[in-house]
């Protein structure tokens, strides 16, 4: 059986999930053969959503001859990764931690409020300052949830 490259798997996921009403947040294929798929939608993810996607993807991967040992479907969690411009638009007003590939004013790590994203440039405010970060310069970005007690 053909294991499938990451690109093949990504293409299948990007074509399949939107038709089911879900967004592909990320996926990973471990050395042990576990395929983890992180999904989301506006109203959040339930256990039933994970089961629905798992059943559907199992069939799709069988047809596409993609082999894996275990398939795990999950929500991305409260600290979900931010990868696309649409993620930064959707979560404008929320806090995030962003690590850049190249420093901006001598700094590579930013924790602040996402102000928005236009023309593939994310605007983040922190410590009374505002910085603009090109999407291509973002190495990692995650939401940073606030817990108020």
From Swiss-Prot:
Its main location: cytoplasm. It is found in: Cytoplasm. It comes from the Bacteria. It holds the Pfam family RimP_N. Keywords: Cytoplasm, Ribosome biogenesis. One of its GO terms (cellular component) is cytosol. One of its GO terms (biological process) is ribosomal small subunit assembly. CDD domains: YlxS_C. Transmembrane segments: none annotated. Gene3D superfamilies: Ribosome maturation factor RimP, C-terminal domain (2.30.30.180), RimP-like superfamily, N-terminal (3.30.300.70). PANTHER family: RIBOSOME MATURATION FACTOR RIMP. NCBIfam families: PRK00092.2-1. Belongs to the RimP family. Required for maturation of 30S ribosomal subunits. This is Ribosome maturation factor RimP. It comes from Neisseria meningitidis serogroup B (strain ATCC BAA-335 / MC58). The lineage of its organism: Bacteria, Pseudomonadati, Pseudomonadota, Betaproteobacteria, Neisseriales. The gene is rimP.
